[in-house]
């Protein structure tokens, strides 16, 4: 039997259930509650209250998301785009990426080492490695520096 989200208490409970599993951004949480049948008139006050209580925190969500994606080997460009697609303000994304303590160049080298382990021998290999690293979200400048054998340390 589906849970009906037609009261403030039901909406709050559903939101807290989602937040208990992992951090969510306000836009993402609102979207999930709407998908479950809650109205905007019930969602907005519930999310406002959760934010006041510190249970819904965009900065904590950003920090958690960035750390998770960085551990998975994703670069700042891909992380930035994923967060923007989730409805977060660009200024908040930039602030969070600037505050994170990830050494992106070291991470780029580690991702490259795990996948390829040797510098490209020809233009085809170089293009292949470059495409892979660009897809993972690293800048072309950093990729070029790495694939040309120059260190940016």
Swiss-Prot record:
Supply the alphabetized keyword list: Cytoplasm
**Domain of life where this protein originates:** Bacteria
Which InterPro entries does the record cross-reference, listed alphabetically? RecX_HTH_1st, RecX_HTH_2nd, RecX_HTH_3rd, Regulatory_RecX, WH-like_DNA-bd_sf
Q: What does this protein do?
A: Modulates RecA activity.
Please state the protein's primary subcellular location. Answer: cytoplasm
Family statement drawn from the similarity comment of this UniProt entry: Belongs to the RecX family.
Q: Which GO terms describe its cellular component?
A: cytoplasm
Taxonomic lineage of the native organism: Bacteria, Pseudomonadati, Pseudomonadota, Gammaproteobacteria, Pseudomonadales
Q: Which gene encodes it?
A: recX
**Pfam families, per the entry:** RecX_HTH1, RecX_HTH2, RecX_HTH3
Q: Which Gene3D superfamilies match?
A: Winged helix-like DNA-binding domain superfamily/Winged helix DNA-binding domain
The UniProt record lists the keyword Ribosomal protein: no
The answer, when asked if 4Fe-4S is one of the entry's keywords, is no
Naturally occurring in which organism (per UniProt): Pseudomonas aeruginosa (strain ATCC 15692 / DSM 22644 / CIP 104116 / JCM 14847 / LMG 12228 / 1C / PRS 101 / PAO1)
**The name this protein goes by in its record:** Regulatory protein RecX
State its location(s): Cytoplasm
Question: Which NCBIfam families does the UniProt entry name for this protein?
Answer: PRK00117.2-1
Please name the GO terms of the biological process aspect recorded for this protein, alphabetically: regulation of DNA repair
């Amino acid at each position: 039997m589906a849970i009906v989200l037609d009261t403030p208490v039901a909406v709050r409970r559903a939101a807290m259930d989602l937040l208990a599993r992992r951090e969510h951004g306000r836009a993402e949480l609102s979207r999930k509650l709407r998908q479950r049948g809650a109205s905007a008139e019930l969602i907005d006050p519930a999310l406002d209250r959760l934010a006041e209580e510190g249970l819904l925190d965009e900065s904590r969500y950003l920090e958690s998301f960035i750390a998770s994606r960085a551990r998975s080997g994703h670069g700042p460009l891909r992380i930035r785009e994923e967060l923007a697609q989730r409805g977060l303000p660009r200024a908040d994304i930039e602030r969070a990426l600037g505050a994170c303590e990830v050494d992106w160049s070291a991470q780029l080298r580690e991702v490259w080492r795990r996948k390829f382990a040797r510098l490209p021998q020809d233009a085809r290999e170089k293009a292949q490695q470059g495409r892979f690293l660009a897809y993972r979200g690293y800048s072309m400048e950093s990729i070029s520096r790495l694939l040309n054998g120059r260190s940016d340390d």
